[in-house]
Regions:
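NAD(P)-dependent Rossmann-like dehydrogenase/reductase catalytic/cofactor-binding core
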Residues: 1-20, 24-126
């Protein structure tokens, strides 16, 4: 509890365990919607998410916080394990990473304008 996490028992081992698998489904769908042009304003999407789910952060900003290279690596590990093309991270995400847009770490990701020294979550504009 000291780290702010709540333990969740998973009865059998599964890649990603339980909470991370649900988060993965959210990430995967958000990335799909964004990469295929269904969501073009990630800030608007995040605001809708936060309102709907009573959350203090949306999935796109959370991916920026985690780091887009980390997100890509995690998604790619699922793809490597399954071989299913639906698990492959979108090329558009790789293009962002190759351009040096890694999220909060570099000040540019889905959002821009992060204070990379302070790590302030409230900063960052689409």
């Amino acid at each position: 509890h000291t780290l702010g996490f709540e333990p969740v028992i998973t009865e059998r081992e599964i890649k990603g365990y339980s909470i991370n698998r649900v988060w993965r489904a959210v990430k995967r769908e958000c990335l799909y919607l964004w990469a295929n042009g269904y969501v073009t304003d990630v800030a608007e999407f995040d605001r809708g998410w936060m309102t709907e789910w009573h959350s203090n952060i949306g999935p796109f900003k959370l991916m920026d916080l985690i780091g887009l290279q980390t997100i890509y690596n995690i998604e790619n590990s699922y793809y490597a394990a399954s071989g299913d093309e639906r698990d492959k991270p979108p090329a558009k995400l790789k293009e962002m990473i190759d351009a040096g847009h890694l999220g909060m770490k570099t000040g540019q990701g889905f959002y821009s304008g992060y204070d990379t020294e302070a790590g302030n979550l409230d900063v960052g504009k689409k």
